Structures are given as C-alpha cells and as structure tokens.
Amino acid sequence: MKIHLSRWVCVDVELNLKRLREEALAAAKTGAEFVVFPELFLTGYTRSLDPQRVRDIFAEVSSAAPEVLFVFGSISEARHNRVAVWSKGHQFAFYDKVHLFHPNGEHEIWDPGQSYVAFEWRDLRIGLMNCNDIRFPEQARALKLEARCDLLVVPAWWPWRRDHIWSTLLQARAAENQLWVLGCCIAGSVEEIEFAGAGNHVFDPAGEPVRTADDRSYELDFNNPPPSIVDPVEQFVEIDCVEIISGD
C-alpha cells in the first residue's frame, strides 16, 4: 500500500487551506491510498477556523480523491483536539486527544477525550493516537490487546530538538505491541513563533524503521509483516497485584 505522510509547514490559514487541496490531490495522483496530515496543521495553536468550514474543505478534498483514506490530524472542534478520518466526502471516524500536553497549555484550550478509538478499513484495524498520547504505553497497549489493531497512526506537533524522543517512543510502541506505527509530525511553523518540527517516522511490527528518501512516500506490505518474536496478545499475562517489599 502506498502511504503519504505530509511534511507540513504551518503558515497563514488561508494559504494552508489552499495547500491542503493541492497536496491532497497531488498525493492521490501519485497513487497514494492513505494520506496523513499532522496535528493542528491548518491553524497551529494560536489561530482559529470555523469547524463547519473545515468540514466542508475535508468533504471537498476527500470527494475529489475518493480512492484515498485521509487522516486529518487534527482540528479544534467541540472543545477537543480532534483527529478526523474522511473518505469519499464523509467523516466516518474521529478521535479526541486524551493526553493533553500541559506545558503548552493544552488543558486550558481543550477538554481531554474520553475514549480510545480504532476503525476498520479494508483488511486493517487502525488505531488513532495524537502527539503526546505516544508517551503513554497503556493507550497503545489497549489498542493492541482490546481492539486488536494492526496499525497505529499518530499525527503530532513535536519539536526537532526532541525528535530522538519522538522516534524512540514510536519505535517502542511498535516493538512492544508488534504492530505498524506511522508518526506524521509538523515540519515547521512560520506564522507564529518560528518552530522547527520533528521528522516523520514509520516502524514495522518488529520495531525496525522503514526508510525513504523524502520521509513522505512509503510502500508498506501489510499482508507480509516480519515474523513475530513474541505474541503480545496470546502471551500476555495480566497481573492485578503489585508487591512492595520493605528493606527494613
């Protein structure tokens, strides 16, 4: 399957909307079947955009490329930082970010989501996470053990100076759960305080990186994953007791 992960630089809102149309259709013309945009890619943290206008744009773009599944991650809607999944002019899944990033004041802007989300597309079960969620292995674990996901998609707004942490966490979630992980990060922002973003990263179920020349275009064979070393579902042992032994 051909996948496109945007390397998006957030600029003026109107220009962002124009570029969204252009990039989405250009990716479709190259044969991409699955296209991901990063967190807050249309507005950044400080600007706003009418949610209905955003939905209209997403409907227009996904109608113009009906063979593509779009993960638009994310927009500000209903007091949530929301990842939206669109196809053929319709939204059929969304996920509200659970683990808000307090150092950026996200808890003052949005309310946390109340559920983890996975959806089925073709023969895949796909779990959604958003940026800071990747720090919490329990979420990825639930998407693997309970939802039986094959793939995690993680839009993000990580800074370049912490790219090593971002990539390490993505790799860990892939290896420990034996699933594919796609991390699509903002490349930069020039409209607010100038910001350099981290990279895009893809890891296979063995935790091995999938490299490309541009960090945008990937060819992944979901039907032939690497052999499992440990089955994280069948071999999981649930323990509900933690012993604390005193040294006295």
Residue ranges and their predicted role:
Residues 1-12, 125-133, 153:
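Active-site-proximal beta-strand elements of phosphoester/diester hydrolases
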Residues 8, 40, 133-134, 157-158, ...:
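Active-site metal-binding loops of divalent metal-dependent hydrolases
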Residues 11-17, 21-94, 160-172, 179:
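Cys-nucleophile CN-hydrolase/nitrilase-fold catalytic domain and related Cys-dependent amidase chemistry
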Residues 43, 84, 95-101, 212-219:
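Short beta->alpha transition motifs characteristic of CBS
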Residues 57-69, 139-217:
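CN hydrolase (nitrilase-like) catalytic-core segments centered on the catalytic cysteine
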Residues 70-72, 94-105, 181-186:
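Short Pro/Gly-enriched beta-strand edge/turn motifs at strand-loop
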Residues 77-150, 159-168, 224-238, 245:
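Active-site catalytic loop in hydrolytic enzyme cores
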Residues 118-120, 186-248:
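C-terminal beta-strand edge segments of enzyme domains
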